[in-house]
Curated annotation (Swiss-Prot):
SUPFAM superfamilies for the chain: Phosphoenolpyruvate/pyruvate domain
Key word Magnesium present: yes
Protein name: 3-methyl-2-oxobutanoate hydroxymethyltransferase
GO molecular function, one term: 3-methyl-2-oxobutanoate hydroxymethyltransferase activity
Keyword NADP among UniProt keywords: no
Gene that produces this protein: panB
TM region positions: none
Cofactor annotation: Mg(2+)
Length: 256
């Protein structure tokens, strides 16, 4: 699937489904589940590498995991989900040339067909414009942006009128410069719905209500694999307990 094809989903009113994967095992499962898009998220810093934020993950680690994701797909190339990879912290904030090099490294050496970038500050917008001119598709990300945790924390964003006006302005700018879609994270459903109606490009929600053009979730959150989930990502099963019980049963059988 090409990034621009997601616009057709919006035109037809078809919900876009995005799940994370970080290795070949998870990508095979997510592909089998029928997700439209696989996001190799920098959240792997926390879920895989044990960090408390996304900030420590490196470009080399993102490349390593995206390559592993590509090896897990079983469908023919033209039937595989679209793969979007997060550009990690400080891979694009330090200038356009560094951003092009980072995104180019991912697209040249892995299955990624697009990158995701957080924010819409003037410097970030310039980077996005440059990447798109270079032929690199970009997904935007607004609202709660985890790479800005030291400034924003993990609180819900755009709760007052000023914040909502800013979010709308940023979303319009993201569309104007050529992003093929935008993620809205942890914002009120009312403003997310407004943005969804205003934009021609797909708006993907996570903790942004049900009226977006699609939803993205961290696979480990949906499967209940951690002992703590964000309030907007209710687990479908208690996978952690299921795994522990199954493995405990095996250990006990051997010991007894």
């Amino acid at each position: 699937m090409l990034p621009k094809e997601l616009v057709r989903f919006k035109e037809l009113g078809n919900q876009i489904t995005i799940l994370t994967a970080w290795d070949s095992l998870s990508s095979a499962i997510v592909e089998a589940a029928g997700a439209d898009v696989v996001l190799v998220g920098d959240s792997l810093a926390m879920f895989i590498h044990g960090h408390t934020t996304t900030l420590p993950v490196t470009l080399e680690q993102m490349l390593h995991h995206t390559q592993a994701v590509g090896r897990g797909f079983l469908s023919p190339k033209n039937k595989q989900p679209l793969v979007v990879c997060d550009l990690p912290f400080l891979s694009y904030q330090c200038g356009e040339d560094k951003a092009v090099a980072a995104a180019g490294t991912l697209l040249k050496n892995s299955c990624a067909a697009a990158v995701k970038i957080e924010g819409a500050e003037p410097e970030v917008i310039s980077v996005i414009e440059r990447l798109i001119r270079m032929g690199i598709p970009v997904m935007g990300h607004l609202g709660l942006t985890p790479q800005s945790v030291n400034n924003l924390g993990y609180h819900r964003q755009a709760e007052d009128a000023l914040g909502q006006e800013k979010l709308v302005t940023q979303a319009l700018k993201i569309e104007q410069v050529g992003c093929f879609s935008v993620v809205l994270e942890h914002v009120p459903s009312k403003v997310a719905s407004k943005v969804t109606q205003m934009l021609k490009i797909p708006v993907i929600g996570i903790g942004a209500g049900e009226e977006c053009d699609g939803q993205v979730r961290v696979t480990a959150d949906l499967l209940g694999l951690t002992d703590k989930q964000p309030p907007f990502a209710k687990p479908l099963i208690d996978g952690r307990s299921l795994f522990i019980e199954s493995l405990t049963s095996w250990v006990d059988q051997l010991r007894n």
